Amino acid sequence: MSIPLLEYAPSSQNQRVEGYEVPNEDTPTIYRLAAAIDDADVDAIIWAGYRQIFSEHLIIKSNRQSFLESQLRNRAINVRDFIRGLGKSEVYRTQVADLNSNYRLVDITLKRFLGRAAYNQDEEIAWSIVIGSQGLHGFIDALLDSDEYRENFGDDIVPYQRRRYKDRPFNLVNPRYNAYWRDRQTLNALGGRSFYSARTSGTLTKDDIRRAIPANFMALAGKILTPERNYQRTIASVTSQIKDIKIPDTSREVTTPEVTVKPVAVALPYRYIPGNKTT
């Protein structure tokens, strides 16, 4: 019994709203099998499928899926089944799935099959559970049988990046793997030994030791540390800066005589009334 897909809240993305951009060279070309009238059009659809699913890095002759191409040319399968076959191929498994963690595999696959990035980490976790319980093939089937895929591409359209703005196209982003694969290669090179047992097997420099420690471990360790301010260092730094500063003497002697105020006779009102002293 497979685990149902966990719920997640979609985030704001360009593809979720209608756009009113003027078409330009960045506007995606829609490849539709129903519009193909000759073999050249079918070749263009096949090429677009390879470019979208395998990305630019894996479009080589040895990675072609001749059986799927033949079925599509003879209309034995539709475009959605052709895309499904590319996702389940050994090329996609060995060159994409096996080189990435489940979280990154989810993000890459969503970009190539649904034309958008993952909404958030909750979606990555939800789909990674599907990968863990149903495998890569079950994950591919779940995406291509989803309502989102059917509403945007149906059975006849090659998936494309929906409403790309400013960023590079998904199929041109390098590399296809990240530090996760490099860390695995390091562990394989150690042959199952721990870092400390490998250290005693020969003379290592500090650079060798730094390369043996995974970068993601250092990043995680840095997040755990509580940021603290070194007040002692701050006080010492400020003290060293101001101890040699000479404050200029801005005082000056008063040379102008002090102004004295003397009383002045003033004609006050009602001075004409007898008996009132108004002066």
UniProtKB/Swiss-Prot annotation:
Q: Which domain of life, per UniProt?
A: Bacteria
Question: One cellular component GO annotation, for this chain's record?
Answer: plasma membrane-derived thylakoid membrane
Which residue ranges does the record assign to the PBS-linker domain? 11-189
* Principal location: membrane
The reply to whether Thylakoid figures as a keyword in the UniProt entry is: yes
Enumerate the PROSITE patterns for this protein.
PBS_LINKER
Q: Which UniProt keywords apply?
A: Antenna complex, Membrane, Photosynthesis, Phycobilisome, Thylakoid
What membrane topology is annotated for this entry? Peripheral membrane protein
The places in or outside the cell where this protein is found are: Cellular thylakoid membrane
Q: Name one GO biological process term.
A: photosynthesis
Task: Tell me how this protein assembles.
Answer: Part of the phycobilisome, a hemidiscoidal structure that is composed of two distinct substructures: a core complex and a number of rods radiating from the core.
Q: What role does this protein play?
A: Rod-core linker protein required for attachment of phycocyanin to allophycocyanin in cores of phycobilisomes.
Q: Which family does it belong to?
A: Belongs to the phycobilisome linker protein family.
Q: What name is this protein filed under?
A: Phycobilisome rod-core linker polypeptide CpcG1
List the lineage, top down.
Answer: Bacteria, Bacillati, Cyanobacteriota, Cyanophyceae, Nostocales
